[in-house]
Amino acid sequence: MRILCTNDDGVHAPGLKIVEEIARALSDDVWVVAPELDQSGVSHSLSLNDPLRLREIGPRHFAVRGTPTDCVIMGARHILGDKGPDLVLSGVNKGRNVAEDVVYSGTIAGALEGTILGIPSFALSQEYSHDSRSAPLWETALAHGPKILRKALDAGVPKNTVINVNFPACAPEEVAGVLVTRQGKRNQGFLRVDERRDGRGNPYFWIGFERVVVVDTPAEGTDLAALAARYISVTPLKLDRTDEGFSEALRSTLA
């Protein structure tokens, strides 16, 4: 099995080494094509107005001056040649990708691009506590990732479906289990605009995350609830985003 690994944190991110180790537990034919720079939050951005710069940094390891989507396309359509990948793994992201994160995540977008290309694809993310100075417990993803991937692949990943896997912020032995979940919804906004001033007094802005303690209990069956209870969350996400329920009401209204 030929595996293509990518991420959005950049080619030198520690999580990329973890996803490569997970891939090597499944196959010895592993390729890494990842962004040269951090591309967190770029979603499914595609570079159409700028050329892509490709740099080989080691055997089967490539850096692309582009987005995760660019990397998967370059890997599947150019670098790997006539024999493209049988599996795309995107991650392991530093931080969870759940609820509304799914819309912004370059990690998930990398896996989505693999799915668009007809390749079974997984997005992998490791939750960690922003309130502590400790690094993510990468060993949790490393310990549980290969088994989850094997079982999901044995079950057969449907076309047009990407699997979003999130590992809880705990040691491998503290994981409560694995839950198949649905995408959750936060009860409050989690982005803020931070205004600052440069040396000339002119304003500039950062968009950032609100690091607040969420006291609301996540809805049962969601990715948020699973991680809160120290379960690994496995969420199948479809490319088709049509709201079938509202479509019928809309047809009646517009008829």
Curated annotation (Swiss-Prot):
Cofactor: how bound = Binds 1 divalent metal cation per subunit.
- Alphabetical list of InterPro entries matching this protein: SurE, SurE-like_Pase/nucleotidase, SurE-like_sf
Where does it reside? Cytoplasm
**UniProt binding sites for a divalent metal cation:** 8-9, 40, 93
Q: Which Pfam families match?
A: SurE
Molecular function (GO) terms for this protein are: 3'-nucleotidase activity; 5'-nucleotidase activity; exopolyphosphatase activity; metal ion binding; nucleotide binding
Q: Which UniProt keywords apply?
A: Cytoplasm, Hydrolase, Metal-binding, Nucleotide-binding
Catalyses: a ribonucleoside 5'-phosphate + H2O = a ribonucleoside + phosphate
- Co-factor(s): a divalent metal cation
HAMAP family the record matches: SurE
What family is this?
Belongs to the SurE nucleotidase family.
What does it do?
Nucleotidase that shows phosphatase activity on nucleoside 5'-monophosphates.
**Name by which UniProt lists this protein:** 5'-nucleotidase SurE
The protein's organism comes out as: Rhodopseudomonas palustris (strain BisA53)
Q: Which gene encodes it?
A: surE
